[in-house]
């Protein structure tokens, strides 16, 4: 290859191939076709596309507003962008690749598995190995609310099977999932639910904001990932009808939860409280109040029962890089007020920050919260510890909590204890985000009413859903359930440890 070609490969983090006939052929074709006026050709592993000419090849979608050249060498793609170009890339290598062993290629582009929600970025490269399960769709869809978002999905050889790949269904799509921002007011939400090709308010037809860039074909593309993903993850609305759904909470238990609220700041209950306060933070990086928000719950034990002491449902004002700090500040106020209402009671405050959506942001929330609570911690003399998770194959523990299979056990435990009257709310329940407009207990009960169990194939395959009908989000419910679980019997995989600044202390 020429020196300029080698420099271009290194610029994008790829090792220049040595004596690779495919790579040489692609490079030659790229040089030859770059001067064409309206190119649209496929040669071996090279694909060139002209402006506004979407093309489909090997389940790949590359719509561009400007020039984009894709050259494959080994198992990787070199993507050369011109100004103002963007694309949604799904790529599958043509098996077999016999030259891969003789001509290995390395890449620093597709190297990040953690999420970046809540942070400002331009490009996101996702390997299919990180999202072949439908549960990861909720994380991917969260990126679509950011206006300067470009997603690159690099698929593996599993792309050809729908059972192992979410991207297989995208072969019939005509749009890219880029720059997707939508606005739907409460008055027109039912209309969007009923009409499958509507993505924004009808009242914005004449004066459409510049940030509304979605059309019905993009909504269809989103639905190809997971059914009802547009309404659930972007618009915040309905959930598809289930074949088998059962109510799991007795009305008698909900009435008891609303009526009986013991005082936890007065004698004798204050002396019988556990010395451990457990907080669970379920962060959501979205400003759409019809979709998911951040759920925060604080619980402790009182004579064998779980008592809810604090509850927050927090929404960001805007999608900025300060999302982690704002969520930490909300949690800080809730924990601080709870401790001040029960001075000298708690000897340890345990905090679990869920990291399923974004491990980077969860770590930032934990570190920021530790800094904010440091003065109060010194004044009241309690220890502040955070739930840690150890990555597979690593001895390093990080200050976030990954929610996996224990979610079903947590809901089973919550339902059992709630129906038996062992889940209560304190009269001194702290809430800075819910109390202004609603009774926090009634707010939580409304979410509990939506809780259903969906059984697909026997009791072994059951899924709990709290978004029935799209009436309310289930963020507070999930936070309360997980806080009660961690307080009663659950423990993080790597235990609880203190954090200080940017260094986790074991």
Curated annotation (Swiss-Prot):
Localization per Swiss-Prot or TrEMBL: Host nucleus
Q: Which domain of life is it from?
A: Viruses
Q: Which GO terms describe its biological process?
A: chromosome organization
Major site of localization recorded for this protein: host cell
Instruction: Tell me its EC number(s), please.
Output: 3.1.-.-
An example molecular function term from Gene Ontology annotations: DNA binding
Q: Which GO terms describe its cellular component?
A: host cell nucleus
Query: Which major enzyme category is it?
Result: hydrolase
> What does UniProt list as catalytic?
128, 282, 354, 475
Per UniProt, the keywords (alphabetical) are: DNA-binding, Host nucleus, Hydrolase, Viral genome packaging, Viral release from host cell
Keyword DNA-binding tagged: yes
Main function: Component of the molecular motor that translocates viral genomic DNA in empty capsid during DNA packaging. Forms a tripartite terminase complex together with TRM1 and TRM2 in the host cytoplasm. Once the complex reaches the host nucleus, it interacts with the capsid portal vertex. This portal forms a ring in which genomic DNA is translocated into the capsid. TRM3 carries an RNase H-like nuclease activity that plays an important role for the cleavage of concatemeric viral DNA into unit length genomes.
Subunit composition and interactions: Interacts with the terminase subunits TRM1 and TRM2. Interacts with portal protein.
The entry's family comment says: Belongs to the herpesviridae TRM3 protein family.
**Protein's name according to its UniProt entry:** Tripartite terminase subunit 3
Question: What organism, scientifically named, is this protein from?
Answer: Psittacid herpesvirus 1 (isolate Amazon parrot/-/97-0001/1997) (PsHV-1)
Origin organism lineage: Viruses, Duplodnaviria, Heunggongvirae, Peploviricota, Herviviricetes
Q: What is the primary gene name for this protein?
A: TRM3
């Amino acid at each position: 290859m020429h020196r300029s070609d080698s420099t271009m490969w290194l610029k994008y983090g790829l090792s220049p191939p040595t004596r690779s006939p495919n790579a040489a052929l692609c490079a030659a074709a790229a040089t030859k076709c770059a001067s064409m006026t309206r190119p649209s050709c496929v040669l071996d592993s090279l694909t060139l596309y002209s402006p506004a000419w979407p093309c489909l090849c090997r389940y790949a979608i590359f719509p561009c507003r400007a020039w984009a050249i894709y050259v494959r060498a080994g198992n990787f793609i070199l993507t050369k962008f011109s100004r103002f170009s963007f694309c949604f890339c799904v790529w599958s290598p043509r098996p077999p690749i016999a030259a891969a062993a003789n001509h290995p290629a390395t890449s620093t582009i597709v190297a990040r598995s953690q999420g970046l929600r809540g942070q400002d970025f331009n490009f996101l490269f996702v390997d299919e190995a990180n999202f072949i399960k439908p549960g990861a769709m909720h994380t991917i869809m969260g990126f679509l609310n950011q206006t300067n978002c470009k997603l690159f999905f690099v698929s593996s050889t599993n792309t050809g099977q729908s059972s192992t790949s979410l991207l297989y269904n995208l072969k019939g799509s005509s749009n890219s999932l880029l720059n997707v921002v939508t606005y739907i007011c409460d008055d027109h939400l039912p209309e969007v639910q009923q009409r499958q090709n509507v993505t924004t308010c009808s009242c914005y037809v004449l004066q459409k904001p510049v940030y509304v860039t979605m059309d019905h074909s993009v909504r269809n593309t989103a639905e190809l990932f997971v059914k009802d993903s547009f309404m659930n993850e972007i618009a915040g609305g309905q959930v598809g009808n289930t074949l088998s759904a059962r109510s799991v909470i007795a009305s008698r238990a909900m009435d008891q939860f609303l009526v009986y609220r013991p005082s936890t700041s007065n004698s004798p209950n204050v002396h019988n409280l556990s010395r451990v306060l457990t907080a669970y933070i379920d962060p959501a990086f979205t400003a759409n109040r019809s979709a998911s928000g951040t759920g925060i719950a604080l619980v402790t034990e009182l004579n064998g029962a779980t008592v809810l002491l604090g509850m927050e449902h927090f929404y960001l004002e805007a999608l900025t890089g300060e999302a982690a700090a704002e969520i930490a500040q909300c949690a800080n106020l809730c924990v601080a007020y709870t401790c001040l209402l029960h001075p000298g009671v708690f000897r340890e405050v345990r905090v679990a920050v869920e990291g399923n959506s974004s491990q980077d942001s969860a770590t930032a929330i934990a570190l920021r919260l530790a800094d904010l609570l440091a003065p109060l911690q010194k004044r009241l003399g309690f220890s502040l510890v955070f739930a840690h998770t150890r990555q597979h194959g690593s001895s390093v523990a990080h200050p976030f909590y990954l929610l996996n299979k224990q979610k079903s056990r947590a809901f089973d435990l919550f339902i059992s204890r709630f129906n038996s009257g062992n889940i209560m709310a304190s009269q001194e329940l702290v809430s800075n985000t819910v109390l202004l407009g609603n009774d926090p207990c009634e707010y939580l009960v409304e979410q509990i009413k939506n809780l259903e169990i969906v059984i697909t194939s026997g009791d072994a395959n059951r899924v709990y859903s709290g978004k029935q009908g799209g009436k309310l989000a289930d963020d507070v419910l999930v936070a309360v359930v997980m806080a009660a679980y961690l307080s009663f019997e659950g423990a993080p995989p790597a235990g609880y440890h203190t954090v200080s600044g940017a260094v986790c202390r074991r």
